[in-house]
Amino acid sequence: GLAAFDDLPTYGHESLEAALQADQVAAEAADLGFDPEELRAPNRPLALARMIDLGDRHVEIVHFGPGHTAGDVVVIVPDADVIVTGDLYEQSAPPAMGADCHLKAWPVALDGILGLVNERTLLVPGHGEPFDRVFAFTQRAEISAVYGQVEYLIAQGVKLDDALKTGEWQYDDDTIAAVLPIAFAQLAAEGKVPRPKLRLL
């Protein structure tokens, strides 16, 4: 999409340039009928934050850390008390927790958003209708609970194949079945794997 705006300032996290070089991204672009060579990273990359002056108002673009992906950014409109969260939040369905998500860090990124929210703030998600801080706190707890439950099951020696039926989940079976291999792999990378429990005689 950004190739169409080469002559305009485009903003995004600095990690996008490397992400666009991934074989999976090239394959997905080809499947959609796009030439992978035409993919463009933002020409105004940011690491943490950038303020943009629009004349009669300014907006802030902030990276609170990895979550839905490594490079999620949030757009804050202070004078309107609006925060555009992108896919860090989803209202119309459970959050998409794909292979490029960061389950452990995701709630921390949401904490950055929640620190800016008051009873009047309107939050605009990546998918669905705008929502308020009650929804924002609830979904933050749900995402955190997914990682926490998998971590608990692994500590109890529960293997991937048994996790869906053994755990207590906030989301539907299809959502959890899709994220479980990702969660187990991310925890395995931290050295957390199911180990058999010794029986006490």
What do the predicted segments below correspond to?
Residues 1-51, 70:
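Active-site HxH/HxHxD metal-binding segment of metal-dependent hydrolases
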Residues 6-9, 26-40, 94-95, 161-180:
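Generic structural signal for short, solvent-exposed loop/turn connectors between secondary structure elements
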Residues 22-26, 46-54, 58, 123-124, ...:
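Short flexible/disordered coil segments
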Residues 22-29, 43-49, 96-99, 117-124, ...:
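Low-complexity, flexible helical/coil segments
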